[in-house]
């Protein structure tokens, strides 16, 4: 029996939630935010912090970094105690800072595509060039072409790895990560591994932290991680930057300070520590999301067979092929909006043949959303 209730949810309409900046009759399955109540330990920790009644400047506490150490040991049997760590406001502020610190204007920065749209933004906003490495799509699955990776690394200064991958949900194998690390060392490429979605895998044995894959990874890699995605605390800005490369971390610390993104807020450490100690909640939310994915797959097969759901065992994001509809994603999401459903166009991630749907919602909400998706398809 479940300890936690994922069928109930707060009413976010009319408030300042980014995902719910929609009309009251619209269902948003777009922005990567959960609709669930947070783990009880998180709420308790925040209330305890709030009750202090004085909210001055704070610094990242040592027990925060200890909590990360314990989390990695419990989840992956990976010891990061000797890794050097830094606090940051978030994965994207960290990424922007690292781009500035480890590359120069108009350098090439490579990443797998389709890609999280903010990767494109951070690269372009810092006056760098994007080198796209397309993932291979076949039979509703993705795979890597490591020859393309090597060609990209010959020209790249930085490689941004999203592991597991957003938006496709692809989980990189240990062997693939080893090859990436060794190619990066061969060509002098820094690997920035964004692992924010890593808690969102039902079978944690499928995930290999990049720096645990091989000794070369520890030499060439910096990891960006945060509990914000896995435990639904994105509004409380907190993240971790860590590496075993001391020279890299010297530049990281300088850059985070230069860009003013290394300051902790009053609630961030408490929320993060409580989240990292809520593995029971994480296990149950992954089970719930997995069941939602199975429901989505069955619904599409039964009622919207023109759509194809990409096979995935990670994240709470569904990547759906709409190429049989004879329309592109930008036009299709407009039709969905007319039917009261808000979803994300694949064009912003680099592939207009797909849409992305958020599954981290109560099943009742997902069911209503899928009914509207069906209506949108039937209206074409």
Pin down the residues of each PLM region:
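PLP-dependent enzyme catalytic core of the Aspartate aminotransferase-like
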Residues: 326-328, 334-344, 348-380
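Conserved glycine-rich beta-strand-loop-beta hairpin in the small C-terminal domain of fold type I
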Residues: 269, 273, 289-297, 309-322, ...
């Amino acid at each position: 029996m479940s300890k936690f209730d994922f069928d109930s949810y707060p009413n976010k309409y009319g408030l300042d939630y980014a995902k719910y900046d929609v009309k009251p009759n619209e269902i948003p399955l777009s922005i990567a935010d959960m609709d669930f109540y947070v783990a009880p330990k998180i709420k308790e920790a925040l209330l305890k912090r709030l009750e202090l009644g004085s909210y001055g400047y704070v610094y990242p506490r040592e027990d925060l970094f200890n909590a990360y150490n314990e989390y990695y040991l419990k989840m992956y049997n990976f010891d990061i105690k000797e890794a050097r760590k830094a606090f940051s406001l978030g994965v994207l502020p960290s990424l922007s800072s690292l781009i500035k610190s480890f590359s120069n204007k108009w350098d090439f920065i490579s990443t797998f595509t389709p890609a999280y749209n903010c990767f494109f933004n951070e690269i372009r906003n810092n006056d760098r060039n994007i080198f796209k490495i397309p993932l291979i799509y076949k039979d509703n699955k993705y795979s890597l072409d490591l020859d393309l990776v090597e060609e990209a690394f010959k020209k790249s200064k930085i490689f941004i790895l999203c592991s597991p991958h957003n938006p496709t949900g692809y989980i990189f194998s240990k062997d693939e990560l080893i090859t990436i690390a060794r190619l990066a060392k061969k060509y002098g490429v820094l690997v920035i591994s964004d692992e924010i979605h890593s808690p969102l895998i039902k079978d944690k044995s499928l995930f290999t932290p990049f720096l645990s894959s091989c000794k070369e990874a520890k030499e060439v890699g910096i990891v960006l991680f945060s509990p914000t995605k896995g435990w639904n605390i994105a509004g409380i800005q907190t993240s971790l930057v860590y590496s075993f490369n001391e020279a890299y971390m010297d530049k990281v610390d300088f850059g985070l300070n230069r860009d003013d993104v290394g300051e902790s807020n009053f609630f961030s450490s408490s929320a993060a520590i409580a989240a990292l100690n809520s593995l029971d909640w994480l296990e149950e939310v992954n089970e719930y999301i997995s069941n939602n994915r199975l429901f989505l797959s069955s619904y599409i097969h039964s009622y919207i067979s023109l759509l194809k759901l990409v096979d995935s065992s990670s994240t709470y994001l569904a990547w759906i092929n709409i190429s049989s509809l004879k329309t592109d994603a930008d036009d299709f999401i407009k039709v969905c909006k007319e039917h009261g459903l808000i979803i994300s166009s694949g064009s912003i991630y680099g592939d207009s043949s797909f849409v992305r749907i958020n599954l981290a919602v109560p099943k009742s909400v997902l069911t209503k959303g899928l009914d509207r998706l069906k209506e949108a398809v039937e209206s074409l």
